[in-house]
From Swiss-Prot:
It is found in: Nucleus. A zinc finger (C2H2-type) spans 243-265, 271-293, 299-323. Residues 86-203 form the SET domain. This is PR domain zinc finger protein 12. Interacts with EHMT2. Changing E172D: In HSAN8; no effect on nuclear localization; no effect on its interaction with EHMT2. The keyword Amino-acid biosynthesis does not apply. Its main location: nucleus. Residues 318-337 are annotated as: Disordered. GO terms for molecular function: DNA binding; histone chaperone activity; histone methyltransferase binding; methyltransferase activity; zinc ion binding. The lineage of its organism: Eukaryota, Metazoa, Chordata, Craniata, Vertebrata. Not found in adult tissues except in dorsal root ganglia.
Length: 367
């Protein structure tokens, strides 16, 4: 796939598209402008679509990704030294706001591998989680722990693969990420026609998901119980949770949520307590822990004004008997309660303090 340079003729408008004497406004039609702004190609299946509708459309309304790339030659000329495979071209991405993308010029067979993905190697402890890391891929060890990250955010480390955008849904995905050895490759998961944008995301199979080992026998069990576990309600949630963890198969609707969840399996703990240096995999867990040092109790009961450092403590308190309306059936068969003791307020305060202390020891639910 690799080895050729972006052809020079792709950087200028074809003479057939611009008649002598026409102004630039007459060449860049409303259709071209609409495609540039909203990333919608009129001809997503190549020249065949234009041939079928040649009696309805003019050459200005049926164009390919290559023609559009030529129309915005000023943008592409900055990348004239970028090494591109002969089978692809760089043009405006079909995803709004994502800049340039990579499109196929010819048919690309299913199973075609592209790569390796290049960039600087970053250790897990040196990753800045506050930055946008969308040009970064994980490389895993055989035991599923993160070995390092490959970061292509710096221009001197970028290759043509950097401009391949992430798919937003299963329907538009045509590439998947695979790990071969300690290198990252993109693999075509279907036959890709000309003038289609290459869009990548994680593969559904745990065998191709960055080389993470799967759970032995899990795939066979899933096939066996496929019809038993199917529920119509679950199918509606499928598209929203298409990004699945290959360890526990939980679905997520964003790449950042999936990465955050993966720290549970990889034991990566980037969040450090400034008081005791204890490490946590989730920022929310760290916030709850820090409150034990600071004494902060932001969760307050509106009935008795008792305060708690964690939401779980408040919810446990609200479920206690004094927050429930008395049951008539229970009152009819229950013995009479003794009269309130003089020290009842002190005992109630002690009970509330004990409940708060117990809440501190409740195991945190990590999702």
């Amino acid at each position: 796939m690799m080895g050729s340079v972006l052809p020079a003729e792709a950087l200028v408008l074809k003479t057939g598209l611009k008649a002598p004497g026409l102004a630039l406004a007459e060449v860049i039609t409303s259709d071209i402008l609409h495609s540039f702004l909203y990333g919608r190609w009129r001809n997503v299946l190549g020249e065949q679509l234009f041939e079928d509708k040649s009696h309805h459309a003019s050459p200005k309304t049926a164009f390919t990704a290559e023609v559009l790339a030529q129309s915005f030659s000023g943008e592409v000329q900055k990348l004239s030294s970028l090494v591109l495979p002969a089978e692809v071209i760089i043009a405006q991405s079909s995803i709004p706001g994502e800049g340039l993308g990579i499109f196929s010029k010819t048919w690309i067979k299913a199973g075609t591998e592209m790569g390796p993905f290049t960039g600087r190697v970053i250790a897990p402890e040196h990753v800045d989680i506050c930055k946008n890391n969308n040009l970064m891929w994980e490389v895993f060890n055989e035991d599923g722990t993160v070995r390092y990250f490959i970061d292509a955010s710096q221009e001197d480390h970028r290759s043509w693969m950097t401009y391949i955008k992430c798919a937003r849904n299963e329907q538009e995905q045509n590439l998947e990420v695979v790990q071969i050895g300690t290198s990252i490759f993109y693999k075509a998961i279907e036959m890709i026609p000309p003038d289609q944008e290459l869009l990548v995301w994680y593969g559904n199979s745990h065998n191709t998901f960055l080389g993470i080992p799967g759970v032995p026998g899990l795939e066979e069990d899933q096939k066996k119980n496929k019809h038993e576990d199917f529920h119509p309600a679950d199918s509606a949630a499928g598209p929203a949770g298409r990004m699945r963890c290959v360890i526990c198969h939980r679905g997520f609707n964003s790449r950042s949520n999936l990465r955050s969840h993966m720290r549970i399996h990889t034991l990566d703990k980037p969040f450090v307590c400034r008081f005791c240096n204890r490490r946590f995999s989730q920022s929310s867990t760290l916030r709850n822990h820090v409150r034990l040092h600071t004494g902060e109790r932001p969760y307050k009961c509106q009935v008795c004004q008792s305060a708690y450092s964690q939401l779980a403590g408040l919810r446990a308190h609200q479920k206690s008997a004094r927050h429930r309306p008395p049951s008539t059936a229970l009152q009819a068969h229950s013995p009479a309660l003794p009269a309130p003791h003089a020290h009842a307020p002190a005992l109630a305060a002690a009970a509330a303090a004990a409940a708060a202390a117990a809440a501190h020891h409740l195991p945190a639910m990590v999702l």
